[in-house]
């Protein structure tokens, strides 16, 4: 494969500096990093170019101090309208100056003379930006829009690891881990109740699984709404909502009538009746139509860990309702308990 096809080769960088000599130095350094470079000597010329060609600019590097212009102008125009990552460079880097630019949207602040090592890794800002876009859109497909170049995320994934330089490989690894973590977080644990996309709270399978895990971790006697909420760590989920769910959960447990199944486990009679009425195993909802149904079981290797066991999700669904494993003191073993709201 031609090395010119590998990312971050061809990263499109626009550089702004009123010092023509240093502007030439920056251009040479960026070209050595295999980036495509466009240079301007002042902000007023650069901004119209960006406004007319936002799709061909991946990153802006701007000098902070101009004789007649404020470097913040480029930040305000570029970051607010197009979200193009902007890096500021300056000869001095006192705390107040750095904070001023970072607070106004700068992705990084480089001290002159800028080292080529810093420029060779400058692509990370574009990578993180597109990773954040991916997280906001909740799907990678939204990043590939007609009329726009392939996303940095897609190009980075398409670059074979064996053809990357050692430096690129080392710096890309933690970022790829962040992407994988985001994917697991999105498809796995719920971290913000607004991610469910509902106007009213819906106790989905995953949310209920986190609730049960918290209850089992605390133990039934110590499971109170405030502590459950602290363990679940779901933004915008209120203590009142957890308290209501906990009350319904405990009421259902009290209403369960022990019945011995063919496997010797303890089941509720209502659960057995529903099993006979609904022999097929597919996705169901409760009577209110607001809960997803799924089976849960404790990992076989963790049965000895009591109430602190975490729940393991099975890849099938049940019409019986939520299945929760409870400790049977008479049998000295765990048995499933089904419950619905």
UniProtKB/Swiss-Prot annotation:
Induction: Daily oscillation and diurnal expression in plants grown in short day (SD) but not in long day (LD) conditions. InterPro entries: ARR-like, CheY-like_superfamily, Homeodomain-like_sf, Myb_dom, Myb_dom_plants, Response_reg_B-typ_pln, SANT/Myb, Sig_transdc_resp-reg_receiver. Its main location: nucleus. One of its GO terms (cellular component) is nucleus. Residues 195-254 form the HTH myb-type domain. Two-component system major event consists of a His-to-Asp phosphorelay between a sensor histidine kinase (HK) and a response regulator (RR). In plants, the His-to-Asp phosphorelay involves an additional intermediate named Histidine-containing phosphotransfer protein (HPt). This multistep phosphorelay consists of a His-Asp-His-Asp sequential transfer of a phosphate group between first a His and an Asp of the HK protein, followed by the transfer to a conserved His of the HPt protein and finally the transfer to an Asp in the receiver domain of the RR protein. Residues 225-250 bind DNA. It holds the Pfam family Myb_DNA-binding. Residues 12-127 form the Response regulatory domain. GO terms for molecular function: DNA binding; DNA-binding transcription factor activity. Keywords: Activator, DNA-binding, Flowering, Nucleus, Phosphoprotein, Transcription, Transcription regulation, Two-component regulatory system. It is found in: Nucleus. The modification 4-aspartylphosphate is found at residue 63. GO terms for biological process: cytokinin-activated signaling pathway; flower development; phosphorelay signal transduction system; positive regulation of short-day photoperiodism, flowering. Transcriptional activator that acts as a floral inducer to promote short-day (SD) flowering pathway. Activates Hd3a and other FT-like genes independently from Hd1. May also activate MADS-box transcription factors involved in flowering regulation. This is Two-component response regulator EHD1. It comes from Oryza sativa subsp. indica (Rice).
């Amino acid at each position: 494969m031609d090395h010119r096809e590998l990312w971050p080769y061809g990263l499109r960088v626009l550089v702004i500096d009123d010092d023509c000599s240093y502007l030439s130095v920056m251009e040479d350094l960026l070209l050595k990093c295999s980036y495509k470079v466009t240079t301007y000597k002042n902000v007023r010329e650069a901004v119209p170019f960006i406004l007319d060609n936002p799709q061909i600019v991946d990153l802006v590097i701007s000098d902070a101090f101009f004789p007649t212009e404020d470097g913040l102008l480029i930040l305000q125009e570029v970051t607010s309208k197009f979200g193009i990552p902007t890096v500021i460079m300056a000869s001095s880097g006192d705390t107040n100056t750095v904070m001023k630019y970072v607070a106004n949207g700068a992705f990084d602040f480089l001290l002159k003379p800028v080292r080529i090592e810093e420029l060779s890794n400058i692509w990370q800002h574009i990578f993180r930006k597109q990773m954040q876009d991916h997280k906001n859109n909740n799907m990678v497909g939204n990043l590939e829009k007609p009329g726009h170049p392939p996303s940095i995320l897609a190009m980075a994934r398409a670059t074979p690891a064996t053809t990357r330089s050692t430096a690129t490989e080392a710096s890309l690894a933690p970022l790829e881990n962040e992407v994988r973590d985001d994917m697991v977080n999105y498809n796995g644990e719920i971290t913000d109740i607004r991610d469910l996309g509902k106007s009213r709270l819906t106790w989905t399978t995953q949310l209920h699984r986190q609730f049960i895990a918290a209850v089992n971790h605390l133990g039934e006697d110590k499971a109170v709404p405030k502590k459950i909420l602290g363990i679940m760590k779901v933004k915008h989920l209120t203590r009142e909502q957890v308290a209501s769910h906990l009350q319904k959960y405990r009421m259902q447990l009290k209403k369960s009538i022990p019945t011995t199944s063919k496997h010797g486990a303890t089941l509720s009679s209502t659960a057995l009746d529903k099993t006979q009425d609904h022999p097929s195993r597919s996705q169901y909802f409760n009577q209110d139509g607001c809960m997803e149904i799924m089976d849960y079981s404790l990992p076989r290797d963790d049965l000895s860990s009591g109430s602190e066991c975490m729940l393991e999700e099975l890849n099938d669904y049940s019409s019986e309702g939520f299945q929760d494993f409870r400790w049977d003191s008479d049998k000295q073993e765990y048995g499933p308990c089904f419950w619905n709201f």
